Amino acid sequence: MSEQMRNIAIIAHVDHGKTTLIDSLMKQSGMFRDNQQVSERLMDSGDLEKERGITILAKPTSIEWQGVRINIIDTPGHADFGGEVERVLQMADGVILLTDAAEGPMPQTKFVLGKALAQGLCPIVIINKVDKSDARSEEVVDEVFDLFVALDANEQQLDFPILYASGRDGWCVVNLDDERTTLSPLLDTVLRHVPAPDVEVDAPFAMLATLLDSDQFLGRCLTGRVMQGTARVNEAVRAINLEGKQVEVGRLTKLLRFDGTSRVPVNEVKAGDIVCIAGLTKASVSDTIAAPSVTTPIFSTPIDPPTMSVTITVNDSPFAGTEGSKVTSTMIRERLLAEAEVNVAITFQESAAKDSFEIGGRGELQLGVLVETMRREGFELTVSRPKVLYKTVDGQRQEPIEEVIIDVDSDYSSAVIDALNKRKAEMSDMRTAGSGKTRIVFLAPSRGLIGFQGKFLTDTRGTGVMNRLFHSYAPFKGAITGRRNGALISTDTGVAVAYALFNLQDRGALFVSHQEKVYQGMIVGEHNRENDLEINVLKGKKLTNVRASGTDDAVTLVTPRKLSLEDMMAYINPDELLEVTPDSLRLRKKYLDPNERKRMARAESA
């Protein structure tokens, strides 16, 4: 047993403050000099993570406290990235469950906690943000206990220590009346409550690969926990997959240990530690990296299957190749294959159509993050509307169902219930949540929730909070009506003119502004009615040599509606596509030529 080490994962709902708490822990444990400038949310290393305030990739870090090395793993709180969570928990011997003092346990708290309890981990519960004006700490503790009971926690797991904290201000207390100074009560609780790794140091080396990334100097890097034995640089190892088949044989060219947020080269790694190794070219996540004498793989949690997919194709619009540097199908294919290799929650399939690829994932957010990442890397591509992945059980078609928890002002609850009923959702619970708020729980088909976020925010005037979580597969619920309004489609290619836009404003909401480039078949707005309408946004004012007073007034344009990438993916209909380039996001019809559109519509209805 390695007494001088603890491995702990931090789990929570999205935006409950995991990453901020780790920042404070690192600052207080002496990881930085007193005069060192430190950025916010150190663990969110990607641009998208910092921008959106969400953790997408699980990352380990390490701090020292009273001579004990504590490895901390920051996990994603969003269920779309749950593929990471399941594997990461296998590296830990204990978990810190972080819950917002006002919001209480949320769907993703339930999702991640359920995974942790199933693996037999004993949590330490932290009620975070207790300094908020609407904090209700005592009630939240009761809700957390009820959640543990609902998730079949055993007696040892139910006997969890409770701490109250403010990760942002860097303090933690055992009782709310205690002096609020540092986070040392939390670190002391970790040393007391989390067991040291129970490992065999003398056995042959074996490690379970949990995370995979690539480094421009080291190549393929596998991060995981050493389950038994020791390993030194340049020793021979073999990689075995979950079926026990050998993947490859190689040498450990580099061994790295985590020190704060950086990786430090070491000559030897021991059982119980979380390390990063380089030197293998084919080994992947869930493989066992072991000494040549080891033949049995280490068990790894099976990953939940993807529930949603999009089709990604080469950009074939009139503006193709003008804004991005990576435009060919070969480049897109290689990038998607690389992503599917590193990210096990993403699946890659060649589509039947030429130059198109089917990408499966856990939800709109995960697929949207992949497309946005590729966009920033200089790719041009087109994306279809997300579609759910059905499965057949005993000859019956089944679809993914999600649990939806909605917190909304009581005045808007009827509008939300009505909207979700139209999307084949079934209400399972409804109760008042205090201060004029209502909490409603639904079971809804995933396909009915595509694009619902925008409508939900409109219906609740931006005050509602919606959280979703994969629940189960259930028999197909029947057809769901899509977008009610038709599209405004450009008839020509060129630059949109203010005069034309001004005269078309009463036809619907426009997506383009003055001097914006458009092409034939591009969707430039949403029609007021149910049918599509073709319009000319290039039409300028007729110039004459006769001037009449009052006819040259400046036109006033309504601000065009701007949609985010995920909103656009959800907005489009099956006969439409989203064009993604580094500079622009454009909606378009699948067939740009109006005659071809009519011909295809006739063929489909025949």
Q: What is the role of each PLM region?
A:
Residues 1-606:
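Structural and coupling elements of P-loop NTPases
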